[in-house]
């Protein structure tokens, strides 16, 4: 079980979210030591707003972002540890990082919400010895509700950054692009199936 807890200004745990999607990829063997979360998709109430915290692998699932948005999240936050496996070519590395940014910026656009993604940097050896380890690509970023980049960190060093986010823009963007309003919820039953026959 992987849990992210948000600590309020009074230094007490405000709420929890448990990672729902667990990977089993080269150098990411989490299915062997984590259990999928059981708390669902519930934003965490803070003095900063309602934060939709989704952990790492959850970032690839538009359903998770949508459920957080529908539950009232005002910002989607993705604490992440993702990088390149040692055998990835430079072209593959570029594709992976671009896909990683694109999918999360897509969550911002589809839900009319800012996205904050925080990723680690550095290298970690694979304790199993199956691979040469992972080089984490950093590149933490903040995107606005239209997917526009408000900030991007470097790929190879730790940084601290303060980024202003205008939460009022989400309402404006949702009026221009009313994706939540125009959903065809009557036609989405098959989304809960593993495969469609």
Regions of interest found by a model, annotated:
Residues 1-13:
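Single conserved hydrophobic/aromatic residue that forms the stacking wall/gate
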Residues 18-33, 157-174:
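A short, polar/charged loop-to-alpha-helix boundary motif
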């Amino acid at each position: 079980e992987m849990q992210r807890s948000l600590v309020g200004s009074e230094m007490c745990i405000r709420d929890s979210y448990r990672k729902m999607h667990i990977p089993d990829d080269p150098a990411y063997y989490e299915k062997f030591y984590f259990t999928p979360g059981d708390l669902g998709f519930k934003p965490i109430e803070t003095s900063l707003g309602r934060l939709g915290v989704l952990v790492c692998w959850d970032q690839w699932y538009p359903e998770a972002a949508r459920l957080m948005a529908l539950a009232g999240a005002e910002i989607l936050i993705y604490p992440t540890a993702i990088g390149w496996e040692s055998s990835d070519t430079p072209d593959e590395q570029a594709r992976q990082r671009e896909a990683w940014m694109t999918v999360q910026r897509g969550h911002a656009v589809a839900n009319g919400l800012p996205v904050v993604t925080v990723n680690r940097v550095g290298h970690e050896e694979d304790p199993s010895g199956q691979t040469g380890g992972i080089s984490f690509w950093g590149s933490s970023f903040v995107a606005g509700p239209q997917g526009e980049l408000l900030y991007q960190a470097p790929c190879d060093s730790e940084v601290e950054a303060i980024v202003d986010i205008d939460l009022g823009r989400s309402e404006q963007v949702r009026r221009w692009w009313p994706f939540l309003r125009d959903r065809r919820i009557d036609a989405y039953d098959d989304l809960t199936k593993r495969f469609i026959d």
